[in-house]
Amino acid sequence: MSVKGDIGVIGLAVMGQNLILNMNDHGFKVVAYNRTTSKVDEFLQGAAKGTNIIGAYSLEDLAAKLEKPRKVMLMVRAGDVVDQFIEALLPHLEEGDIIIDGGNSNYPDTNRRVKALAEKGIRFIGSGVSGGEEGARHGPSIMPGGNQEAWQYVKPIFQAISAKTEQGEPCCDWVGGEGAGHFVKMVHNGIEYGDMQLICEAYQFLKEGLGLSYEEMQAIFAEWKNTELDSYLIDITTDILGYKDASGEPLVEKILDTAGQKGTGKWTGINALDFGIPLTLITESVFARCVSSFKDQRVAANQLFGKTITPVEGDKKVWIEAVRKALLASKIISYAQGFMLIREASEQFGWDINYGATALLWREGCIIRSRFLGNIRDAYEANPNLVFLGSDSYFKGILENALSDWRKVVAKSIEVGIPMPCMASAITFLDGYTSARLPANLLQAQRDYFGAHTYERTDKPRGEFFHTNWTGRGGNTASTTYDV
């Protein structure tokens, strides 16, 4: 009798192929399938040649070649394609079999699929996979959620192929029910947007404000790798700043300043609005990409307004250290806001997400991997009920130490004309979050004035609502239908 596969993978684009090869390297027998079956032969005769990888040429063939309970992982484009493959797979599966979606699916789709497939006796996992092509091949960060009964069967495979911390801990663990895994991956992507934009803002201040050369900036970022800023994105930025093209000039200087996006940052911002979480920095990072896409309009506006950037005066070494502190403090706010969003979703959906374990998932293997994720894990292990990351003693100390320089950098950027939407939004958030009293009292009075939305009073218990007839003409009826 032929040996059967431990897991099947559908989708032989680069991510799918690399995950399969990774699984094979760790001793798992993988059955590979692609809708265009010629790609199966190409894979088996190419990258998979000489391995124990098994080819399948139909979904029926795939199911027949798998050990029970069958485990089938979809590495296909998010959206309708996932549903199409699920429907096509169902006739070939049995009760208790497992389907895993390893794509960048939107978590409401995963919520729906978990429930719908459970009614058919199929266990569904929605798993975020981060790290790109290299991570898939050598160790990604994996964020599984969904039907927890399936986890025991998938866990040995996923934890074996995932990235590992220096202590050997797998950057993969169960996140929570329904779409928790894909939700956490979505927030990961949003934080990635924020991290990248923050680095770009620091780069622009150093380059255009301080007038530093690429050689000088590369040396600065290389030095920052030895601080709390140590991360994959700082690492690759160091490489990028030092990369010369064939003419010997910095290549990045010749790259058009328009940034693309695939939409996951936007998803994070939309969900923050839906959940009522002030995800200001990540949302600004999405808008920064939007502004960058208006290249022709920006050039025209630059000419119309005669926009110039005034050089920053003063000791450059002092300013460089101030920028480092501002970058680090802003990054803390970005992660703090991201975890606030994860917490809110976990509480609303009953996912019971472990926030310290989530930080560990990102410690290696993914784009936002960084040194201080270990400190985030420590903070949540010390206090699982930590609401705001900046309240932890370690991060509070950094924020307090950075605050003066952070303000100087943001204020100076406004003064000289350097856009810093994320650093500015980060410090503005902290100022708002640490304010015992905000001007929302006036805002609520305005709402009551034009819409009779009522208000609470500082001299009365919370939960008691009042309405004022501000003009003498509006009566005393509170609004229950009109809201702003």
From Swiss-Prot:
Q: Short name of one Pfam family for this protein?
A: NAD_binding_2
The family database entries (InterPro entries) matched by this protein are listed as:
6-PGluconate_DH-like_C_sf, 6PGD_dom2, 6PGDH_C, 6PGDH_Gnd/GntZ, 6PGDH_NADP-bd, 6PGdom_BS, NAD(P)-bd_dom_sf, Pgluconate_DH
Mention one GO molecular function: phosphogluconate dehydrogenase (decarboxylating) activity
Q: This protein is called what?
A: 6-phosphogluconate dehydrogenase, decarboxylating
Name the active site residues. Answer: K185 (proton acceptor), E192 (proton donor)
A GO cellular component annotated for this chain's UniProt record is: cytosol
Function, as annotated: Catalyzes the oxidative decarboxylation of 6-phosphogluconate to ribulose 5-phosphate and CO(2), with concomitant reduction of NADP to NADPH.
Catalytic activity reads: 6-phospho-D-gluconate + NADP(+) = D-ribulose 5-phosphate + CO2 + NADPH
Residues noted as binding substrate in the record, renumbered to the chain: N104, S130, G131, G132, H188, N189, Y193, K262, R289, R447, H453
Q: Which residues bind NADP(+)?
A: G11, L12, A13, V14, M15, G16, N34, R35, T36, V76, R77, A78, N104
Pathway it works in: Carbohydrate degradation; pentose phosphate pathway; D-ribulose 5-phosphate from D-glucose 6-phosphate (oxidative stage): step 3/3
Supply the alphabetized keyword list: Gluconate utilization, NADP, Oxidoreductase, Pentose shunt
EC primary class: oxidoreductase
UniProt record similarity statement: Belongs to the 6-phosphogluconate dehydrogenase family.
Q: Its gene?
A: gnd
Say if the entry is tagged with keyword 4Fe-4S: no
List this protein's GO terms for biological process. D-gluconate metabolic process; organic acid catabolic process; pentose-phosphate shunt, oxidative branch
Nucleus: is it a keyword of this entry? Answer: no
What EC number(s) does its UniProt record assign? 1.1.1.44
The record describes its quaternary structure and partners as: Homodimer.
